[in-house]
Amino acid sequence: MEKTTTSSKPLSRSEINKIIAVATGVKEAKIKEIFKYLNTLLLNELVSRSVCILPENLGKLRITIRNARIQKDMKTGEMKHIPPKPLVRYSPSKTIKETAAKVRWKYAD
């Protein structure tokens, strides 16, 4: 796997596609098509089952419902009813958690 240079900006989609195309020898257009299909597949899985396991040990996406609640409006002071809301939650895999623990933060001593 090719090591990427550290820069202030994350890789763009096209840069990721280029890196994968060079590493695998597959055309960039085909890589883009594969990612489109993967996106559709994961979204369909998430909608139908509320849980989606990401490939290659990346983690898991799941839909949870935030409970309804009553919240005070700070401007008027009246109590407002906030309805339940679906949220997408990401649970990273153990590998990602371990890798993130090794990252040196720029604000750390």
UniProtKB/Swiss-Prot annotation:
Domain of life: Bacteria
UniProt xrefs under SUPFAM superfamilies: IHF-like DNA-binding proteins
Pfam families: Bac_DNA_binding
Gene Ontology MF terms: DNA binding; structural constituent of chromatin
InterPro entries assigned: Hist_DNA-bd, IHF-like_DNA-bd_dom_sf
The protein's name in its UniProt record: Uncharacterized protein MG353 homolog
Source species: Mycoplasma pneumoniae (strain ATCC 29342 / M129 / Subtype 1)
